[in-house]
């Protein structure tokens, strides 16, 4: 839940790793409900893309898209194509959520097609003599099992996979793609009582509304400071936006050296830490008596070591890092 809140507040991409039946898909489906309402400009742009893909429905106006293509989808289905070119799933998720379940089961060209839009928010389609560019600013949520049988690390069921099989399975996802993902969440096996009738849903609606208010307050804080969510900060602006304390800088420098992180990964950790700090700021702000939301007058403090420490834990276990 905490990582989902951070992802929503900062527009960060999210990788969920865990055995089957642990609720990875349910978590992904909750994300759109935590995101801020679409602005008129966002709704217009998303509707225009959907119209080009012949997938516009008036009843969905203003609702953030949630696209969940099957793992058998081709690179063309994800990216788009045709004559004339039409947007694929990547663009149809513009201003919304793209959920890729069973991530290693997608073919390699399809996965590699994600790299451009994750960096730029746009996708270029070149087919024969035609070339088209579509917006593709989506929030990626990906899910995978930890191994081919799905039970590596499952205390309730033994894993049948050899180390070599696990390495091959995880190796289907390239290092450059993994490096572009922000948050890793290991989703553990839950006891059956967790999913008993009424146990999950009793306070879930109220809890979601509370988290959504914090997310919106943190987004407003970031927007007022830099005109964009934290995940969309360019590398040159990341450190100044973080405004880190000396303790935060020292902690991240030590972690980066020990874990061999690249400059791209460092920037991602600073962005995550900035979001953690924003959530901490709005969490301590006095609530508006009318709405219950955090007031917009809360100051934006620096990123401290405690914020960096939380951000590090979402990166240190990424496959290949």
Residue ranges and their predicted role:
Residues 1-3:
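N-terminal pre-P-loop "Q-motif" helix
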Residues 5, 59-65, 70-98, 130-131:
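Conserved alpha-helical scaffold flanking the Walker A/P-loop in AAA+ ATPase domains
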Residues 10-15, 94-96:
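Pre-Walker A (Motif I) flank of P-loop NTPase domains
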Residues 14-58, 120:
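Walker A/P-loop
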Residues 42-74, 81-82, 233-239, 243-246, ...:
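Conserved inter-motif catalytic segment of the P-loop NTP-binding fold
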Residues 85, 108-321:
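Basic, amphipathic alpha-helical bundle interface domains used for macromolecular binding and assembly
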Residues 95, 101-102, 113:
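Walker B catalytic acidic pair
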């Amino acid at each position: 839940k905490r990582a989902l809140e951070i992802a929503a507040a900062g527009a960060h991409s999210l990788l969920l790793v865990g055995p089957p039946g642990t609720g990875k898909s349910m978590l992904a489906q909750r994300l759109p409900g935590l995101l801020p309402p679409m602005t008129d400009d966002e709704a217009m742009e998303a509707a225009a893309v959907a119209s080009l893909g012949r997938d516009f429905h008036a009843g969905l106006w203003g609702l953030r898209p949630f696209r969940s293509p099957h793992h058998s989808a081709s690179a063309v289905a994800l990216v788009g194509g045709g004559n004339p070119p039409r947007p694929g799933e990547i663009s149809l998720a513009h201003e919304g959520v793209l959920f890729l379940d069973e991530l290693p089961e997608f073919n390699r060209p399809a996965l590699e097609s994600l790299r451009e839009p994750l960096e730029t928010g746009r996708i270029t389609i070149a087919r024969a003599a035609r070339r088209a560019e579509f917006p593709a600013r989506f929030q990626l949520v990906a899910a995978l099992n930890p191994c081919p049988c799905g039970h590596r690390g499952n205390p309730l069921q033994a894993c049948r996979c050899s180390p070599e099989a696990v390495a091959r399975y995880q190796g289907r996802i390239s290092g450059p793609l993994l490096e572009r993902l922000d948050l890793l969440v290991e989703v553990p096996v839950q006891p059956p009582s967790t999913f008993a009738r009424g146990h999950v849903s009793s306070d879930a609606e109220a809890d979601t509304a509370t988290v959504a208010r914090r997310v919106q307050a943190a987004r407003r804080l970031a927007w007022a400071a830099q005109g964009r969510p934290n995940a969309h900060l360019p590398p040159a602006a990341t450190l100044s936006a973080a405004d880190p304390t000396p303790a935060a800088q020292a902690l991240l420098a030590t972690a980066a050296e020990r874990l061999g992180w690249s400059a791209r990964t460092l920037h991602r950790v600073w962005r995550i830490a900035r979001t953690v700090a924003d959530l901490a700021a709005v969490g301590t702000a006095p609530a508006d008596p009318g709405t219950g939301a955090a007031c917009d007058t809360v100051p934006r403090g620096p990123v401290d070591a405690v914020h960096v420490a939380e951000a590090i834990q979402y990166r240190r276990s990424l496959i290949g890092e």
